[in-house]
Amino acid sequence: MTPEELSAAISACLKDAVSTGEIALTESAVPDAVRVERPKNRDHGDWATNIALQLSKQAGMNPREFAGILSNHLQGIPGVTGVEIAGPGFLNITVDAATAGALAKAIVEAGASYGTNQALAGRVVNMEFVSANPTGPLHIGHTRWAALGDAIARVLRASGADVTAEYYINDAGSQMNVFANSVLSRLHGRGVPEGGYPGEYIRELGDEVLKAHPGIRELTDEAALPVIRAAAYEAQMSDIKTTLAEFGVEFDVFFSEKELHDAGAIESAVARLREQGHVFDDGGAVWLRTTDFGDDKDRVMIRANGEPTYFAADAAYYLSKKDRGFTEKIYLLGADHHGYINRLKAIAACAGDDPEVNIEVLIGQLVSVNGAKLSKRAGNIIELKDLISWLGKDAVRYSLARFPADSPLTLDPELLKKHSNENPVFYVQYAHARSRGTARNAAEAGVDRSVFDASLLDHATENELLSYLGSYPSIVAKAAELREPHRVARHLEVIAGAYHRWYDACRVSPQGEEPVLDVNRTRLWLNDATSQVLANGLELLGVSAPERM
């Protein structure tokens, strides 16, 4: 029995109790799905639910009285062997081995879809993350959001949301002029201009520009700068996209700030927000009255000299997302952008959206790496591509995904390079590789999945493993709800541990001249179910599931 099947069965029992008048609720008040969880202490049963605590007040009943009535109905669910009322009204449910073991077959048959759900179906989400300036290579400061943003997008999609992963290119404004001037200066051997970009990559970009425009040095600086700006920008964005691909991060949209300006979107945004009564003029400048919606001060949109501010572009960009049909806009920003939360929410409110529903701003803390070498090529920073070459994509992505975004993080390269159980990514990947090796050995021994007898999965380690496999869908749903993919990573580690214990206690393949029995065939189902869940979870984290290690 899967958690979803038990959930539906409890809901049906509750509706029966309502229809007989034992519980005074309207049928519409009964949820179609009742949340079930694994109790922390397995002596308390296989599954637990707090539905009596949730609905008893509405029914005008004591929670334990409510639980007692529901308990009588639950006893009739096929496979349920016991129901106990605990504490103020929790229901602890025990199922027989055959009912519990049936989950293994259900997982294998579900395949890659096991763990997915439709909790967020109908939600149209724009997720903007990384959005590094196209003035240099991706570095460690961008790495955490690349890994986490992609993982969050994956768990949201696994929960039914329609997600667009978007990279906002800051290709307008003064920093692009500084960037172009830095390349120009290097082309003419002038060194780094004041306030310019250092690093060997600037020289490399100059070589790219020279290759595309051999006569660039003969032009005046004024004539050369627009050419250099365009060519160096294209080369740098190509480098960024290549690095993201190497890191396994895919974006659906690369959105240009410059195109906002060129299309007149800034002026349009000011006009729209003025029509809604949120724009005012003062001191020759145009302002947005964001203090009406919790911001600490009103924000300038158009300076007195007629130049739009970055904030104006932020407002136009938000309206673009709204116009493109995204009802939810998620921004993933670094720790130095904490002040952006209120101003972005104020923009949403000025645009007529609910800032508590239509916009979400996630702030991440910094990440560092012990012993990492600074890249002179990039101006004494740690490049993402160097990190991938040094530690491997999987180690970096998994390590970044297994911690909450708001916790500071220091990666330990020595740990991440170890092939031992101390290394979390190795521990999980090895469990998957071991399960695939077990399947190959079983095939050589003549063990197949022609028979499945769930009642044979009665060993304590099998019960433990099944319980964690059964919890996986709820973990994915919770990870999506809270934007916390680390929940998936941590649960995979729990599954890996349970699998290794089961592997040591229960053989899939017969030994020597022993015949192939139904217990071997049934255990192969459990082995393959574990393999499937580990692969599904690693996929959500953007990490490979190796066949061999």
Swiss-Prot record:
Q: Where is this motif: 'HIGH' region?
A: 132-142
Q: Which reaction does this enzyme catalyse, per its entry?
A: tRNA(Arg) + L-arginine + ATP = L-arginyl-tRNA(Arg) + AMP + diphosphate
Q: What is its EC number?
A: 6.1.1.19
Q: Which GO terms describe its molecular function?
A: arginine-tRNA ligase activity; ATP binding
Q: Where in the cell is it found?
A: Cytoplasm
* Xref: InterPro entries: aa-tRNA-synth_I_CS, Arg-tRNA-ligase, Arg-tRNA-synth_N, Arg-tRNA-synth_N_sf, ArgRS_core, DALR_anticod-bd, Rossmann-like_a/b/a_fold, tRNAsynth_Ia_anticodon-bd
Q: Which organism is it from?
A: Paenarthrobacter aurescens (strain TC1)
Q: Does the keyword Ion transport apply?
A: no
Enzymatic class: ligase
Q: Which SUPFAM superfamilies match?
A: Anticodon-binding domain of a subclass of class I aminoacyl-tRNA synthetases, Arginyl-tRNA synthetase (ArgRS), N-terminal 'additional' domain, Nucleotidylyl transferase
Q: What is this protein called?
A: Arginine--tRNA ligase
Give the Gene3D superfamilies listed for this entry.
Arginyl tRNA synthetase N-terminal domain, HUPs, Isoleucyl-tRNA Synthetase, Domain 1
Instruction: Give the gene name.
Output: argS
Q: Specify one Pfam family.
A: Arg_tRNA_synt_N
The record's annotation in CDD domains points to:
ArgRS_core
Output the HAMAP family linked to this UniProt entry: Arg_tRNA_synth
State if Cytoplasm is listed as a keyword.
yes
Predominant location category: cytoplasm
GO annotation terms (biological process): arginyl-tRNA aminoacylation
Instruction: Quote the PANTHER family the UniProt record gives.
Output: ARGININE--TRNA LIGASE, CYTOPLASMIC, ARGINYL-TRNA SYNTHETASE
**S-S bonds:** none
Quaternary organization: Monomer.
Query: Taxonomically, which superkingdom?
Result: Bacteria
Q: Which UniProt keywords apply?
A: Aminoacyl-tRNA synthetase, ATP-binding, Cytoplasm, Ligase, Nucleotide-binding, Protein biosynthesis
Q: Which family does it belong to?
A: Belongs to the class-I aminoacyl-tRNA synthetase family.
CC per GO annotation: cytoplasm
